[in-house]
Amino acid sequence: MENFISDLASFIWTWNVPVLVGSGIFFLIYSKLTPFKYLKHAFELILGKHSKEGDIGEVTHFQALTTALSGTIGLGNIAGVAIAIQLAGPGAIFWMWLTAVVGIATKFFTCTLSVMYRDVGEDGTVRGGPMYVIKNALPNSMMPLAYFFAAAGLIGALPGFQSNQLVQIIGDLPIFQFDNFNLIAGVILAGVTGVIILGGLIRIAKVSEWLVPLMSLLYFGSVLIALMLNYDSIIPAFQIIIADAFTGSAVAGGSVIAVIIMGVRRGAHSNEAGIGTETLVHGSAKTSDPVKQGLVAMLCPIFDTLIMCTSTALLIIISGVWLISDSTGVTLTAEAFSALLGPLGYAVLFICVVSFGASTIFTYSFYGSACSQFLFGEKGVKFYQWVIILFVIVFAVIPIEAAINIIDISFALMAIPTLISTVWLAPKVIFKAREYFSALEEST
């Protein structure tokens, strides 16, 4: 079964890579690089400079960004990068950069649409995401795509990677190396998860609002210190990444295609551009204009892939552990931290992994709950939340390869309705963007 899941993931991502990257390139060209022209304005938005009293929505721009970042900045940046380097070599990082660059435009389009076509319930509750975009903007004949996304999202939002890697780094400590530790740790983690996720989006957003920025600064600061102490190795590390991206020398058989596929797979898991998950929370943002949230959302690939993933990759490459270690995932990153910063480095990574892993589980629970609500109504949400709690335990005890392949398959399937609807409605986004930026220029 494990081999079948692995083969299926490889097959699906072979064709999903050109679809994701090609769509991003289309959005870049079609928008005439508009997202990049307004990066400064996007940063002003997350600082609340252009917010208005009475905006419709559940959470602020900053909360929406940090909640979405808690799903993207996390173990994908720490363990996902290690897995990419381990399986495909440093060259995979170059292709992760590519997904981030085109992903900036993709996120602008998908998240703008999520606000444009979101649902506002009678009680004022706001719901967004690809399924509502399809429901409210496309012909009724396209509704199967909405159900397809939500069904795939039920699996894609399960905390497979996070639960597995969180338990792995804790289990690496000598004190916890005993029989059935993974099961015991999974049960404890499931209990903590239940306390948070049963509180809904508002509680998740409040936790993410302070936890994600704090842990991001701690992690990035630690990596920055390690890089400064080894500054003479930074340029050679970049040279290794770029050279390996076009040779595939670190992959068995020297396949460049394998390097590209792995880089895009891990890039998609890192920044989620084009997958549709991030639109679920950005669609709930308090905003008077959809374009504002599209601008805020497009910052995610910059933070999580271009900054965080690159930092982790440089750390692992400079440490040299990727050449000599058989460790996998978060353990390989931990060895790199220990090699460059000693026991203190490991301690910092441990704190960050626990925090990031937990916050990502909380965010993914909201993603899955939103899909469940669309398919089954409010009664389905509570049931699905208990399913998440159960699967925290399940994924804690299965091999990392199985956990990550299951999520990768689901992500690839979720991208299909997301990108179809976004390409279809791209002219609507451009029309809204022109209105917004014209008004912005007149007011300045």
Label the predicted regions.
Residues 53-87, 113-131, 135-137, 148-151, ...:
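Alpha-helical membrane segments and immediately flanking helix-loop junctions
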Residues 19-23, 27-43, 167-170, 181-229, ...:
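Membrane-interface loop-to-helix entry segments
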Residues 17-22, 97, 146-151, 174-201, ...:
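Transmembrane alpha-helical segments of multi-pass small-molecule transport proteins
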Residues 1-75, 86-92, 103, 393, ...:
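N-terminal alpha-helical transmembrane segments of multi-pass membrane transport
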Residues 102-110, 187-201, 212-232, 265-266, ...:
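Selective recognition of specific alpha-helical transmembrane segments in multi-pass small-molecule
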Residues 110-118, 122, 223-240, 254, ...:
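Extracellular/periplasmic helix-exit of transmembrane alpha-helices
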Residues 16, 30-35, 76-81, 157-169, ...:
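Transmembrane helix-loop junctions in multi-pass membrane proteins
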